[in-house]
Amino acid sequence: NPEDCWLCNLLSQAFQQKKEYDRALEMGWRAVVLSKGDNDQQINFGYLLYEIAVESPATDVLSHARRWQREYPDNPIVRHMTGAMLNAGHVSQINSVYVRDIFNAFADDFENVLGSLDYAVPSLMAEALEALAQNVRLKKMKILDAGCGTGLCGAYLKKYAKFRGLDGVDLSEKMLEVARRKKLYTRLYNQDLSQFLSRHENGYDLINAADVFTYFGELGSVFVLMFDALKPGGRILFSVSENSHNKDDYFLHLSGRFLHSKSYVEEGLKKRGFIIEKLNRVKLRNEGEAEVWGWIVMARKP
């Protein structure tokens, strides 16, 4: 009965708030089982494991992660989230099916959730473009909003794309439905970003990528594709989260998102031919009690 699994989910949240973590995990797991492995409950259980790992390091979440992995070995959400917990150091990319499913599940609540996290990335990127516009004429650009989601960046990008158009591409069809209702974009594409870029060489004056590289570990390949998709003199503007956990180039955090080192991003851009114009360290959002820091980066194709 689907109502039973949602009841278990609510009980799980209540136990978590009371810091009764073992009972929270028991109810969260029961919700997964009662739903017969429904993706919504898999996502809820994954975030429950992550939040409890952060809130209560003494709680043995890894044994729950191993059981989850054993019971649902073929589910992309389970594979990714248990991978982040059990062997984060060996993961370089995120399964695109996982990204699609997670954003399809969150599409309706996405902007409300980000609002509660003090999510600053779109406004920070808008400021970077405003600063550039003081010195460079930007009004007639063809722009790609890569990983456009619900269109949070579309509002500030649209004014720079009045004549040549603003395109958006995203894996999640449900996020694109929300973006479409805003009527900000000239065209919207439901495609994998790498595949899309490979078909649009010399197509854009600006590629905007807000919080996209949190779902890419290795960045060299996508930097090459973005370089080729830009017209000469074109720019990329993106955010990236800071890896302050270790000395690795990139690191898959317990949250299931990648963090990157500053030197890896800088060297990767230069190696692919970009000229770095801006690299500002900023607070991107809150995550629980913690602040997530990273960089707003702008780089130009000669």
Residue ranges and their predicted role:
Residues 44-100:
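N-terminal auxiliary segments of SAM/dcSAM-dependent transferases
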Residues 144, 150-196:
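Class I SAM-dependent methyltransferase SAM/SAH-binding core
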Residues 208:
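A conserved beta-strand element that flanks and buttresses the S-adenosyl-L-methionine
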Residues 220-235:
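A short glycine-rich, Lys/Arg-flanked "PGG" loop and its adjoining helix->strand segment in the class I
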Residues 257-272, 279:
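Short alpha-helix
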